[in-house]
Regions:
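The feature captures the conserved acid-bearing segment of alpha/beta-hydrolase catalytic domains
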Residues: 246-337
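N-terminal cap/lid segment of alpha/beta-hydrolase-fold proteins
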Residues: 102-129
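Bacterial Sec-dependent N-terminal signal peptides
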Residues: 15-41, 102-103
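Alpha/beta-hydrolase active-site loop
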Residues: 182-216
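C-terminal catalytic histidine-bearing segment of alpha/beta-hydrolase fold enzymes
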Residues: 299-411
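Surface-exposed interfaces of beta-sheet-rich extracellular modules
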Residues: 56-84
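Primarily recognizes the serine-hydrolase "nucleophile elbow" in alpha/beta-hydrolase
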Residues: 218-266
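Short beta-strand element of the alpha/beta-hydrolase
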Residues: 131-139
Length: 411
């Protein structure tokens, strides 16, 4: 009975978080500024309009050039987190925000580096004055190139480098071999074996890191961290635990696949969750497990936090976050989606990205622009729709919170 009550309590907790963050209306009210509405003004970004008191309002910085990243908001900043995408409850006053940006000097190096048994695909960058090393772990059936070839993970790398972190990326041994060695049907990291020698993935990472130490590209004296998505999220918890890293951030992962790590870790662990995660092992039950695991870690006196990324409206310029789609083209795609009835009245997308592609396939005449996109551009649209619908995918909406956790897991 106690267990049932505990689960119900967590369901209510998550539900209350969702309801508290769900806007009554993201769509600006008609001009004329009724008595129960006030104005939001956004410079260098999106979200300007009149909103009713009590609405949850989303704002976004403008798209970044390849050599820049979002830095901070000026204005009524007590209302928001300092993220490129932030939201707040509309107060009974006019508010204004202006986005500022930071130039990033960065160039990722790729090479094949000998690990324990095989040459591994490795991407890395060691900025001057680095304050720490961050390892990035792809999800099941992913690869090292996932982090550099997709916009959202690429945005994370820029944020890390801009804030002084070195980055090391490689891939699971099963991916290198293109062989499902344990027969679980996926190409994955070994996340349930907390052994630095017998876990092939951990042995590989140690060998690669030692290579960089021996080249004098970095120092053994700076702290280390890791970030992973899905299976990579579980692996990040296990890796941090095995090598006693300062902290780890697990995206779209509950930690149950990380062996005994949740019960033994001395590393700070942050769980980064999606509100409507559509992976079979996550969803509401997975989010509850992650929250329970975070609490369990805290109960042992180790710092742990979690957050839930909530669904957000689609705005016309959204797809231009990736420069392979212009703002004009993004606006045309948005209009086709809107005209096809795929958006709610508050501009939230109905369902997941597959709804768009099913509609395009069944009625291509309604999507003359979207149906003509290249495969790369289609993938960009899918990636951004996954972000706003909080599907099972990495998202950069909380990069600042993750780096804040790394800087001080007990903040």
């Amino acid at each position: 009975m106690k267990k049932i009550l505990f689960i119900l309590t967590n369901i209510c907790l998550i539900s209350s978080l969702f309801l508290r963050c769900t806007p009554v209306s993201q769509t600006p009210v008609p001009a004329g500024n009724p008595a129960d509405s006030f104005k939001v003004s956004v410079t260098n970004g999106y979200g300007t309009g009149n909103y009713k008191i009590g609405d949850t309002v989303h704002i976004w910085s403008r798209e970044c050039a390849s050599n820049e990243t979002f830095d901070f908001w000026n204005g009524d900043t007590t209302l928001i987190n300092q993220e490129w995408h932030s939201w707040f409850i509309m107060p009974a006053k006019n508010v204004a925000f202006s986005a500022s940006f930071k130039t990033v000097s960065w160039n990722i190096t790729y090479e094949k580096i000998k690990a324990r048994n095989n040459l591994k695909n490795v991407y890395y960058i060691f900025p001057p004055g680095q304050i720490g090393i961050v390892y990035l772990f792809h999800g099941a059936n992913g690869s090292a190139s996932y982090w550099v070839n997709n916009y959202e993970p690429n945005a994370l790398i820029k944020d890390l480098v801009a804030n002084g972190y070195a980055v090391i990326i490689t891939e699971a041994e099963e991916v290198t071999l293109n062989q499902d060695t344990n027969g679980d049907g996926e190409l994955r990291w070994v996340a349930n074996n907390l052994d630095s020698v017998n876990n092939i993935d951990f042995a590989n990472l140690k060998a690669i890191t030692d290579t960089f130490y021996n080249r004098k590209l970095t120092s053994r004296n700076i702290p280390r961290y890791c970030i992973g998505q899905s299976n990579g999220g579980s692996c990040s918890i296990a890796f941090a635990t095995t090598f006693n890293l300062t902290a780890a951030a697990a995206y779209c992962a509950a930690g149950g696949a990380a062996g005994t790590a949740v019960n033994t870790t001395k590393s700070g662990i942050q769980f980064c969750l999606e509100q409507l995660d559509n992976n079979s092992t996550m969803g509401l039950s997975g989010n509850i497990s992650a929250i329970n695991n975070s609490q369990s870690i805290q109960n042992r006196g180790v710092c742990s936090k979690y957050f839930i990324n909530i669904t957000s409206p689609l705005y016309p310029e959204r797809f231009a976050r990736n420069t392979l789609i212009s703002k004009a083209l993004s606006g045309q795609i948005f209009t086709e989606i809107q005209n096809a009835g795929l958006l709610k009245s508050n501009n939230k997308f109905i369902g997941y990205a597959s709804n768009l592609w099913n509609a395009v396939k069944s009625s291509p005449q309604k999507f003359p622009v979207t149906s003509g996109l290249s495969v790369t551009q289609q993938n960009i649209v899918t990636e951004q729709l996954n972000c706003i619908t909080t599907a099972h995918q990495f998202f950069s909406d909380h990069d600042k919170l993750t780096m804040r956790f790394f800087n001080n897991p007990c903040y």
